[in-house]
């Protein structure tokens, strides 16, 4: 049966060619953020929102909930900014939370550049993708969680261990906090 109907082309979000992934030279130069998904024991899906500083690969925060819309992302970023300061740029993929006008307006008001990777090219956000793999293998796949509170508690405990005790080979076999100490003045 040939109906000769026109095939409607998909709308594509075209972005200019991104810059190659550079190694930041100081803290708060570029942050990366991404989402991960998993399930509780009862089968309900939850999401984790991960934010790292690309300079020392420090995990700045892991937010866990069943739904993490753009206002929740902004609230999590504001909490991180309170103690860490503003980044110059944040690298992220093209998820609906990231391309929302709410997040774009927030970033513009704070003077933060949102760097979007090309669709289907997660290697352009390699720092946080590698971090996600570590999150997945070090604790997310190791336990079965009954509640969101259990997941958030485990995430907070693991984040401290990751930043303070776990050596990172990408930054010379030292922990993210040791890398941070090499550039931050020590209070006397």
Where are these regions (language model features)?
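Charged DNA-binding/catalytic regions of mobile-element recombinases
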Residues: 1-188
């Amino acid at each position: 049966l040939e109906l000769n109907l026109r095939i409607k082309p998909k709308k594509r979000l075209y972005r200019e060619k991104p810059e190659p992934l550079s190694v930041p030279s100081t803290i708060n130069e570029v942050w990366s953020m991404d989402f991960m998904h998993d399930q509780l024991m009862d089968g309900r899906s939850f999401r984790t929102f991960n934010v790292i500083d690309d300079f020392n690969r420090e995990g700045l925060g892991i937010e866990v909930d069943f739904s993490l819309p753009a206002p929740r992302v902004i609230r999590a970023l504001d909490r991180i900014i309170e103690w860490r300061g503003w980044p110059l740029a944040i690298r992220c993929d093209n998820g609906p939370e990231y391309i929302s006008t709410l997040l774009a307006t927030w970033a513009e008001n704070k003077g933060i550049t949102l760097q979007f990777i090309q669709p289907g090219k997660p290697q352009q956000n390699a720092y946080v993708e590698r971090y996600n793999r570590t999150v997945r293998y070090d604790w997310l796949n190791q336990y079965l969680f009954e509640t969101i509170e259990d997941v958030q508690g485990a995430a907070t405990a693991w984040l401290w261990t990751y930043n303070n005790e776990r050596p990172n080979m990408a930054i010379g076999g030292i922990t993210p906090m040791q890398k941070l100490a090499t550039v931050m003045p020590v209070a006397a």
